Every structure is written in C-alpha cells, then in structure tokens.
Amino acid sequence: MQSESGYNPVAMEETVLDTKGLTCPMPLLKAKQALNALAPAALLRVYATDPGSVRDFAVFSRQSGHELLESNEQDGVFSYLLKKKS
C-alpha cells in the first residue's frame, strides 16, 4: 500500500518511539531527540496519548521541514509517522 505522499510502508524500516503516558511537551521533545539521531530521510513512528500532540506534531512538521506522512488516532492512542528532512 502506498500513500499519496509516495510513502511505501513495505519499502522503509521505521524507528519506533513510544511516548504513551507522557504529557506535553514531552512527546514532541522525545521525537526531536530521536530525529536528531536518525539519518536524513529516515522514518520515525511516534505513539502518544496526549491529545495536544496532534497540534504539536502538525506545527512541528511545518516549522522544522520534517514531513508528517501519517497522523492517526485509534482507541486514544495517536500515531505519527515522520520522515526526517534530507
């Protein structure tokens, strides 16, 4: 399956960051740290339970240049897939 952004979930491995239970601003801060450790164009999947993270990750991706490929919510768990800028 390929999204309209061109992301093919089978083609690239994701680094997973679990921030469930953490409140603002910790999910975003942990994601920033994780992205800093990744190579350009690497994928980071973040799981969070803080509802404020929806806004935080959308704004962060626009301001930082990292691409937000997915933003989903299921049973109170938010999932974000970020692609580190090249």
Task: Please state what every model-predicted region is.
Residues 12-14, 41-45, 77-79:
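Intrinsic-disorder/low-complexity, polar/charged segments enriched in Ser/Thr/Lys/Arg/Asp/Glu/Gln
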